Amino acid sequence: AEDHQNYYVISEMFEKFTQGYDIVCASRLMKGGDYKESKEPFIKSILVKLVSFILIKFTNLQTLDPTNGFRLFSRQVIKKFPIQSKRGFTFAIELLAKAYRSNFKITEIPSQNPIRNFGKSKFKYTSIIFYLPWFLYILIFPPQK
């Protein structure tokens, strides 16, 4: 992990989990959340907002911030879906996509993404190649009935 999250939200995530949700996403883009861009690569901040806009506009995905990998997954989600992703944080988007298609309960809580005071993002532009198939999966394959 990049050690770049507000871990104070873990108790709130767990509370949502105890209410029956299978995935609880920390969202920087929902009301009460905050996405500090000052030390993030400019292209990354544009991509985060673009992907979120597209998925919100064309799907019923229950998170406004699908690119944030800070999530709580239920044991059922982890056991049901073998992880195929081999690079970086792609597994978080993969599990979200598969759970969405299988009608697992997904919710989000607001989270602030603090300004990075040390280190740098592990985001690589080449990672987009690995994220893209899962975003397309969400767009192309609606939840099963």
Please provide the spans of the model-predicted regions.
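A charged, well-structured terminal subsegment
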Residues: 143-144
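Phosphate/oxyanion-binding loops and surfaces in catalytic or ligand/nucleic-acid-binding neighborhoods
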Residues: 57, 102, 139
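Catalytic beta-strand/loop signature of glycosyltransferases that borders the donor
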Residues: 63-65, 103-113
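The conserved acidic donor/metal-binding loop of glycosyltransferases
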Residues: 1-4
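Acidic donor-binding loop at a coil-to-helix junction in glycosyltransferase catalytic cores
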Residues: 89-95
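Hydrophobic residues within well-ordered alpha-helices
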Residues: 17, 99-100
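Acceptor/aglycone-binding surface of glycosyltransferases and processive sugar-polymer synthases
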Residues: 7-89, 115-126, 130-135
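Residues at the C-termini of beta-strands that transition into short coil/loop
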Residues: 27, 99, 110
